[in-house]
Amino acid sequence: MPPKSSTTKHIFVTGGVASSLGKGLTASSLGMLLKARGLRVVMQKLDPYLNVDPGTMNPFQHGEVFVTNDGAETDLDIGHYERFLDRDLDGSANVTTGQVYSTVIAKERRGEYLGDTVQVIPHITNEIKHRIRRMATDEVDVVITEVGGTVGDIESLPFLETVRQVRHEVGRDNVFVVHISLLPYIGPSGELKTKPTQHSVAALRNIGIQPDAIVLRCDREVPTAIKRKISLMCDVDEAAVVACPDARSIYDIPKVIHTEGLDAYVVRRMDLPFRDVDWTTWDDLLDRVHNPEHEIVMALVGKYIDLPDAYLSVTEALRAGGFANKARVKIKWVTSDDCKTPAGARVQLGDVDAICIPGGFGERGVTGKVGAIQYARENGIPLLGLCLGLQCIVVEAARNLAGVADANSTEFDPATAHPVVSTMAEQLDIVAGEGDMGGTMRLGMYPAKLAEGSIVREVYDGKEYVEERHRHRYEVNNAYRAELEKKAGIVFSGTSPDGKLVEYVEYPRDVHPYLVATQAHPELRSRPTRPHPLFAGLVKAAVERKTSK
């Protein structure tokens, strides 16, 4: 159905009262509903920090770095957008204050402002506006832009001023602002309090933005009287005051906000062409989420487990692997340091059905990851290694099977006598401190050729060539490949098309049912409705192992 007008519509999502309210999930759910109504939707996140991208940020502070097909290192919310929309996004989906200022300062140095005094308004806001409006192509009906931070933060002001200007320039009928606010419950008095939301909306109006809808985040159902009060005090239609209580699964959120009528209100208010929501695919997903036939325990052995967001795409990919097998995947968070010794590994991993070794950087925790791999190999526990996980599998094989006791990676010991994992040639200067760390890894989508008869070729449905997203500086040292295959029995089952870079390793089926690893980050391409084959294969192996006991 063609749009009634050629103007691409803009929906802006802001947050108030507190951070971590789930703006990204709410925006993603709205995007999924609009797509299910036949609209072409793209999404974008505006991040108010001064880093150019999150690539050099501590995972404990920021969570995971989500890499897009074109190699951009972006915010984890971009992962939510891709999973809910089932659409690949690119680097333009994440705009940071650092990117904006870098561009404006570079233009000033080139003399592009012709003597102007460069200021936040109009130069910074114009650059933000350009990055928002360039998403509005002829192939897009709706752009949903999430404004990071909380209304009232100093850092968010240029972005919010830009939202006001966009609304003025493209027309009020073409812009819709959704404000997400916390509705706290005060236990002793037994009341839901509306005052924080009123103050948050007042702060937004002070900047010149009147929200068109308010989403109330709370831990319980919201009475109609509370909605009416917020509608009156915040000057929003009662139909546009939407309650979004905590859900059992994040994949329930689209149904929640659809039941509250947000998507219907948006399409009518913006005069968008629409059809009824097609729930076919999503209902099948929810059936798999809530009515599993199996349950398995999956150990995620990592070094950043105090902040689960550091492994967000991995955990979602593991759960999606469960959906593919009608299984519920319970994540057991295991600190890698607890697996340093065989006894420690046995305590942590003795009761699990499968293990995932995710990526990471630096020496801390690596000994434990190697210990976990040894335990899985010796006890036939299905294991999937990702990026650093692959490198640790190669190190473990060299040390314990090939007789190279001091085998290591140059990342952990630059002077190691046996660098079975080494720095990629083009990364040597950067590792030596002679280049920028940010945005310089092997990033983005790269192809691989899979060996005939291998487990990975089988799980990829027999495909000879596959593509995955990458983020690494180190690779398996080709000088040790023949020795490791001969002495350790490990199979290098996938390489770059020229055969020079190891992309997949595994053990033969008669040695281990499923000990597989990839240098890539396949979790970044997993979707709840289209689980990634490597994760589906891992869960399948775990279910088979558990049911055969």
From Swiss-Prot:
Residues at which Mg(2+) binds: D77, E146
Chemical reaction(s) catalysed: UTP + L-glutamine + ATP + H2O = CTP + L-glutamate + ADP + phosphate + 2 H(+); L-glutamine + H2O = L-glutamate + NH4(+); UTP + NH4(+) + ATP = CTP + ADP + phosphate + 2 H(+)
A Pfam family matched in the record: GATase
Name the UniProt record assigns to this protein: CTP synthase
Native organism: Streptomyces coelicolor (strain ATCC BAA-471 / A3(2) / M145)
Description of activity control: Allosterically activated by GTP, when glutamine is the substrate; GTP has no effect on the reaction when ammonia is the substrate. The allosteric effector GTP functions by stabilizing the protein conformation that binds the tetrahedral intermediate(s) formed during glutamine hydrolysis. Inhibited by the product CTP, via allosteric rather than competitive inhibition.
Family affiliation: Belongs to the CTP synthase family.
A GO cellular component annotation in the UniProt record: cytosol
Residues given in the record as UTP binding sites: S19, K193, T194, K195, P196, T197, Q198, K229
